[in-house]
Each structure stands twice: as structure tokens, then as C-alpha cells.
């Protein structure tokens, strides 16, 4: 390392230590330990590796995090990239630091495709154990995204996209604006380099004139009026970050030149009453723009952000946005969750708890093993605008925009949701799919005889409601299968003239199952037919079976009655024209009639091919391909459509390149008509160009 590099490291370390004079010795020890462990390791940039953990620690120090988090930041890569053990960290720096380092390590290096969702799941679950883990990971990601220039373009875009879709929204939901804005701008730079440069140049050219305008015409006028009322305030202006400016042009369909509020004025006062007094003063000085006032003091955001926002028409007809808040609100707005987890000595981090939305997110993904479902739940919890409604008792409830009374019912309690029979909004009866609006007073009407239906899945907005409904329906379906299984078993018992106990014992001799319930489910689901079960118990006792002679058509109503296999090349489903090929080992192999793999069989052994009428009930797997213009939220929108159509996603794979996304899904459908309905809905999703069935 050059002497200049060593000096820079020493300066950064001194800067870090200056934040924690009482714990400087411990932090110095952690730095020396990490430096020794990483040894000669280099970053992709060619710099000494120790620069990275030091940068992560400095960012967390800016947020005012406790000294344990800073030590964990310095050590966060030692478990994964060096020979350091958990016990070694625990012995040298304490159990809480060791757990933090382990928490970050457990999240692992994010991989793509099938493992991506599982890593996100680990990220959220680790965060629930100690919210400092997510702040460590966000700071880690921020430092890494700044060095994306060292990678190939494809990898740069993948990491930038993930940063924009997951990490920046997480920072937003946790209220850590300083990290959120930087993550978005760096990701924006690599995802849309041309647009980034246009916005950067536009801000550079516009800022000077706007600053002069605010200093000359706006701030002096406001300051003079505040002094008249004896209000002590700090007045400053700040620039919107590049991505938010570009996003505004896309959202509103306007040109960059039409964005007039790239600079905003922030007024910080001592008390809440002063905030409202300042608001009145501003509205008396300048004309407010209708619909541009938001009171986040009375109605805080879910991440506890509070401020008054108003946009006014100031001198020379220019639009100016004001944010008014107290110092305490300002601290929370800048540092978000970090301002709540400044731990005292000996205090257990878990005592601080987590935000309710984070708990709900953990609950929604904890038991999920479906990668697409994990991603859907995660993204739906990160990307949403809020709507504020009230219960009849006056309790405030915050929900995603587009939520319904059913979402509110499940937000209140699972049992309220499961027995939701109707709703009133502002005293009027509304349908269950009514879209709630801010300010609505909503009363949920319950009925003990009412239960969820599949239809609810088509309109609920929150992942909590969707998961609770699915859980109920799954349980209900299981009970139905058990009841049907009991009925079939009783019919077999009567037919054979055996006692229940004797029948179960005879079945156990021939069929392997762990519990009687498992057997009942197999019978109820038609995984094993009553005829086959009787043959297994009494091989010589065969049921009379009507033979279809002189017919080349095979009617399949119960797939468990005949040995068969669905061809993986075309995956036929009920409603397709299907041909079955008789084979020695696999039984009847089912193909879609136009399948190219049938050509040789039809030419050489036509007698082995039978026409098949597949009339079985249940779900069948098939593949579809979706080609679309890539955008944030695309995967979430498509998986939501599939889920709401009553289909389950078995697997999915997404490839993106040059703004185009190609997504392959294996889905479960009832029949061809069901599949066509799903594909029609997918084609209506914004940006989708092609949705077709996929044959291999």
C-alpha cells in the first residue's frame, strides 16, 4: 500500500474513533483484528480489503449507531472470507457482536435465479432477530454498489436491479433516507446510464439559478415573518436526488424541463405547535397549491416519518415545496430505524422490537418455500403507497393503497378476517372488494358462519390477508379430503365385511403409511383408488371391470387407476388433444397431439398410440413463457395475476438483457380453459409483449 493510502486509512479510522470516545479502544482493537485477518486480500478495485469494512463502519457512525454495530461492521466479512470462527469473535468482542456478524454472514452472498428468493428470506428473518443486521447489510450494499464499475455490464445491471428492487425499498421502509437515496442514485447510474447523465446535467445547470432564487426571494421573506412571531428555526434547502427526479418524469409523463421543484425548503423548529404556526405563515405569504398539502405529523408514515409537506406558488410564479418538522422528527427522518436502536450498555437489542410491517413481512414469508411467493410477498410489502383509515373507535390503521375491507379485517385479527361477512364505510354498506380511501371510517361486520373464499384472493392487496386466506382454504381442503377418505374407507370396510381395526391392520401389511390420517388423505385425494387398495389387500379378489373392446380411445377420469406418465416435452393438460403411447416400463405416456416427439412413433408403431380423453380432476403442470419490457415490479405483477387466477407457481426463471425480460414459469392449472384465462390476464399486464405456452 502506498504511503498516501495508509494516511487515508488512518484519517478514516481517526474519524470513526472520534464518534465513540468512550469505546475507542474496543473499536481500534476490532479494526486491527480485521486488518490482520484480511491480510493481503484486495477488493476488485485493487484496494486493500480493509477499506470496505471501514467504509461500512463510517456510514453507520454517521447514522449514530451504537459501538457494537460499528465493531460488527469492521468484522462483518471475517467469518466468511477469513479463518475466523464465531467463538473467536465471541471471546474477543462479546456474544452480541458475534451474533451480529453471524447474522450478516447468514444472509450470504446474494445469488440469482432459484436461490435469490431464499437469500431475501434469510435477510428478513435475520433482520427480525436483530434489526441492526439490516442496517449493516444496507451499509455493506451501499459501499459495494459504488464499485460496480469493475464488473462486466451484465453483472453490473443485475446487482443494480436488485439494489433498486429490494435494498432501496427496504431502506425506504426503514426510514433511512440517506442510504435509500444513495442506493437509488447509484443503481440508477448503472441501470440507465444515459438517463442518469441527462438528469445530472439538468440538475447541475438548474441548481445555481434556483439557489439564487430561494436565497433572494423566498428564504428572507419567510425568515423575517418567523422572527416577527418569535419562532427560532433553521431554514435550509436541499436538492432532490437524481432518481426521484427521473421517476417523477416517468410517473407524470413530463419532460425534465417541466420539473420545477428540484430544490425544496426545509424548516426545522422546536415544537409541534410551531410546525403548524409556520405552515400558517407560509400559506399567508404564498398561495398554496390545492391537493399538495400532506400532514405526516398527525398521520405518520409506517416507518414513523413525520413532517408537514406543502407546495406553494411563490414569487415569479415558481413552485416551491416546504417541509416543516421538529428537530426530533428531523433526526428520525434522516436516520429512520437507526434512531430507535441506539442501544445502551447491557440492553438486549430484541427489546426494541421491530415495526409492525416488518413483523407482518416475517410472518408472511416464514413458512413459505415457493421462491415466487417469497418474492411476491417481499415486493408487495416494500412497494406501496399508504392509505389511512379509521376504525369506529377512532384507531388509525395504515394499509397499502388499493386495500379492501378484507385486508383491514385481517390487519385487525386473523379471526376477524376469517369471519368477515361485510363492511360499512362512513356508515354505508360497501362490498368486500371496495377500495378503501384515506379518511374512511370502516366497520367490519363479522358472522361466525362466514368463511374465506377463493374469490377473495382476486381482490385482496396485502400479503398478510392473502396468506391467511390461503392457510384457511388449505386447511378446509385438507378437512374435505379427510372426510372423503373416511367415506371411501368405510365403503371398503362394508364391502369386505371387516371391522375398522382389521381393515387398517390388513392395509398396514400391504401399504406403507405413517398414520391413518395419511391413508385417509391419499384416498380422499384419489392418490390411491379403492379398487387398487382392495387388490393390494386381496390380490385374488378382483373387481369386475368393464372392458372397452373395439375402441382406440382411453378415458382417464382417475389417473391413479392406470400406470401413466405425462411427457415432459409437452406436458398435456385436460382440454388438449392428447395421444397416449403404450410403453413397457412407463405405462401410458401422454403427449399433446402436435408434439414433435410423436412423429416417429406414429410412423413406425401406430398401433401403440391411443387417443386419450383426459377427464381427471385436480391440477396439472404446464410451462409458459412471458416476454416483456423490464421494469421495477414486473415479476411481482405477473406472479400476482397467476396467484389471483387460482394457480400455483411451481418454479420460475427470469433472464434480463438490454431492457427485455424473459420469464419462464411452471404453473399448476385445472385444464386448458384455466390456462388460457391466466395467459389472457398476463397479456394485460403493463409491458408484456408475449405470453405463450412453452414446449420443450
Curated annotation (Swiss-Prot):
Residues 623-696 form the ACT domain. One of its GO terms (biological process) is guanosine tetraphosphate biosynthetic process. Residues 383-446 form the TGS domain. The keyword Manganese applies. It is an enzyme of class 3 (hydrolase). InterPro entries: ACT-like_dom_sf, ACT_dom, Beta-grasp_dom_sf, HD/PDEase_dom, HD_domain, NT_sf, RelA/Spo_fam, RelA/SpoT_AH_RIS. It catalyses: guanosine 3',5'-bis(diphosphate) + H2O = GDP + diphosphate + H(+). Its cofactor is Mn(2+). SUPFAM superfamilies: ACT-like, HD-domain/PDEase-like, Nucleotidyltransferase, TGS-like. Residues 49-145 form the HD domain. Keywords: Hydrolase, Manganese. Coiled coil: none annotated. SMART domains: HDc (SM00471), RelA_SpoT (SM00954). The keyword Hydrolase applies. Pathway: Purine metabolism; ppGpp biosynthesis; ppGpp from GDP: step 1/1. Its EC number is 3.1.7.2. CDD domains: ACT_RelA-SpoT, HDc, NT_Rel-Spo_like, TGS_RSH. Gene3D superfamilies: 3.10.20.30, 3.30.70.260, Beta Polymerase, domain 2, Hypothetical protein af1432. GO terms for molecular function: guanosine-3',5'-bis(diphosphate) 3'-diphosphatase activity. In eubacteria ppGpp (guanosine 3'-diphosphate 5'-diphosphate) is a mediator of the stringent response that coordinates a variety of cellular activities in response to changes in nutritional abundance. This enzyme catalyzes the degradation of ppGpp into GDP. It may also be capable of catalyzing the synthesis of ppGpp. Belongs to the RelA/SpoT family. This is Guanosine-3',5'-bis(diphosphate) 3'-pyrophosphohydrolase. It comes from Aquifex aeolicus (strain VF5). The gene is spoT.
